[in-house]
Amino acid sequence: MADGKGPVVALVPAAGQGVRLGENRPKAFVDLGGTTMLTRAVDGLLQSGAVDRVVVIVPEELVESTRTLLPGEVTVVAGGSERTDSVRAGLAVADDADYVLVHDAARALTPPSLIARVVEELRCGRNAVIPVLPVTDTIKTVDVLGAVTGTPERSELRAVQTPQGFTAELLRRAYAAADGIATDDAGLVERLGERVRSIVGEPTAFKITTPLDLVLARALVEEGAH
């Protein structure tokens, strides 16, 4: 059991393709102000001062080139076809971890201070921690034909960011019990009936997914915000 003092290992799945981003390469390797999104995401983790080791998971054919791109202390391993496969590959080389962060490479502008706050919550005894922001748009649920089936109460909704943090023991249990594809690690923990703690996120920790997101991210970098 984690005692609040053990090592923190951050996993960065970076095998997603840049289809919605309009790029012909994995989106983690798209340029953002003269360097890749992946490099910026890893730098943020290291600059937080709260992470002991970073493990990056990429397509097998990019392992060697990624190692030359990142600082020597970063571990790079091959992932799988799905995000869950990549996180499992990262966990397999994180035996030393008491705590694990899972961070999207596409959230390249995440402030180091947010990363440190997630880790602080873990060290204070939380088993699962996620950063969130209030949802500003009204959300509708729809059926397969596009007909509206409901309107969730907006005050109860939150947009989830990363890094998501967990005790290593809990995240391993969640992945051992996972029987399908998941885009959210906290969701796997919830399936175990475990409580997930939310903290206030940061606007700049947005996920760079669409061409418009990339325009915004590049503008922020150019203005010197990051």
From Swiss-Prot:
This protein's pathway reads:
Isoprenoid biosynthesis; isopentenyl diphosphate biosynthesis via DXP pathway; isopentenyl diphosphate from 1-deoxy-D-xylulose 5-phosphate: step 2/6
The reaction(s) this protein catalyses: 2-C-methyl-D-erythritol 4-phosphate + CTP + H(+) = 4-CDP-2-C-methyl-D-erythritol + diphosphate
Q: Give the first-level EC class, as a single word.
A: transferase
Q: Which CDD domains match?
A: CDP-ME_synthetase
Q: What does this protein do?
A: Catalyzes the formation of 4-diphosphocytidyl-2-C-methyl-D-erythritol from CTP and 2-C-methyl-D-erythritol 4-phosphate (MEP).
Please state what the protein is called: 2-C-methyl-D-erythritol 4-phosphate cytidylyltransferase
Q: Which family does it belong to?
A: Belongs to the IspD/TarI cytidylyltransferase family. IspD subfamily.
Swiss-Prot/TrEMBL keywords:
Isoprene biosynthesis, Nucleotidyltransferase, Transferase
Question: Carries keyword Nucleotidyltransferase?
Answer: yes
Q: Where is this site: Transition state stabilizer?
A: R20, K27
Question: Matching PANTHER family, A to Z?
Answer: 2-C-METHYL-D-ERYTHRITOL 4-PHOSPHATE CYTIDYLYLTRANSFERASE, CHLOROPLASTIC
Residues at the site labelled Positions MEP for the nucleophilic attack: R154, K207
One GO MF term on file is:
2-C-methyl-D-erythritol 4-phosphate cytidylyltransferase activity
BP-aspect Gene Ontology terms: isopentenyl diphosphate biosynthetic process, methylerythritol 4-phosphate pathway
Q: Which InterPro entries match?
A: IspD (IPR001228), IspD/TarI (IPR034683), IspD/TarI_cytidylyltransf_bact (IPR050088), ISPD_synthase_CS (IPR018294), Nucleotide-diphossugar_trans (IPR029044)
Mind telling me which HAMAP family this protein's record contains? IspD (MF_00108)
| Transmembrane helix listed as a keyword | no
What's the name of its gene? ispD
For this protein, the record's Pfam families field holds:
IspD
Q: Which domain of life is it from?
A: Bacteria
